[in-house]
């Protein structure tokens, strides 16, 4: 097993190294297809410089079934917590998002359960009534929702709008639907606006990530084919464009994950024709250039169907009362192609 060092609370991580986070308390079991989201502390906690926020892990699955529970890493106490939230319909390979108008909320769409795909939307509001029991509410949507599908992302939201393109039907098959679906979290309405340009072919296991007002789609698979292409959708003009990328082009890959930082997209892991990978690539949106990132020290095991989020990590500065913030990529769980499923927490600095 690789010997990846543990990053302690407020310790400064080095660039080009992987670390393990080991929160205390009862960690989740091994899982695939969950989502990870960082939620900042509510403003009233921030006046004293406290309030590091929390990472919320929702749903997922392993051979024992799909999950209706959520786990929290409380970054102030560096502890796992299993909150008393009820009402989530069990799902994995779903999508999670936080609308701009409700920063203290978490919404989910789609995903799969044992025998069926979901197309429902549920929302959990942290602003509801103090620290008491909270409930996932099923959102009564208007308009025509997409068909049930897997759609594994936590970064497909621009403002208050979630953008849904393609997704998984069953097994290695993508949905046949080539329509763009847009969910407005304020009006709770689904629409299917017309687009122009060249859309991607239908696929599942693709990365969908927002950078400014653009949505980027990378990779994915359909049948036996692994895609290596990248497309952008301008969410204002609704025009698709194929990206003419340069640099270290990633191979065809599916079930990878992404985070965005400073107009750069970072992808890690996924399944390629050669099996699960542990490579990380950076895409500079302004230069349209890919770079394969090089690391020192041990690397995490290759994995797919994990989830990642951007983690603002507070670092205690010597001779100072103030903390510096470094932005980390946080990775949880996933599996390799030999059937080993993970429940580890990994981080690396994004530069």
UniProtKB/Swiss-Prot annotation:
<dbReference type="InterPro" id="IPR052124">
    <property type="entry name" value="Rab9_kelch_effector"/>
</dbReference>
<comment type="function">
    <text>Rab9 effector required for endosome to trans-Golgi network (TGN) transport.</text>
</comment>
<dbReference type="InterPro" id="IPR015915">
    <property type="entry name" value="Kelch-typ_b-propeller"/>
</dbReference>
<feature type="repeat" description="Kelch 3">
    <location>
        <begin position="162"/>
        <end position="210"/>
    </location>
</feature>
<feature type="repeat" description="Kelch 2">
    <location>
        <begin position="105"/>
        <end position="156"/>
    </location>
</feature>
<keyword id="KW-0880">Kelch repeat</keyword>
<feature type="repeat" description="Kelch 6">
    <location>
        <begin position="328"/>
        <end position="351"/>
    </location>
</feature>
<dbReference type="InterPro" id="IPR011043">
    <property type="entry name" value="Gal_Oxase/kelch_b-propeller"/>
</dbReference>
<keyword id="KW-0677">Repeat</keyword>
<feature type="repeat" description="Kelch 5">
    <location>
        <begin position="264"/>
        <end position="313"/>
    </location>
</feature>
<feature type="repeat" description="Kelch 1">
    <location>
        <begin position="54"/>
        <end position="102"/>
    </location>
</feature>
<dbReference type="Pfam" id="PF24681">
    <property type="entry name" value="Kelch_KLHDC2_KLHL20_DRC7"/>
</dbReference>
<protein>
    <recommendedName>
        <fullName>Rab9 effector protein with kelch motifs</fullName>
    </recommendedName>
</protein>
<feature type="repeat" description="Kelch 4">
    <location>
        <begin position="214"/>
        <end position="263"/>
    </location>
</feature>
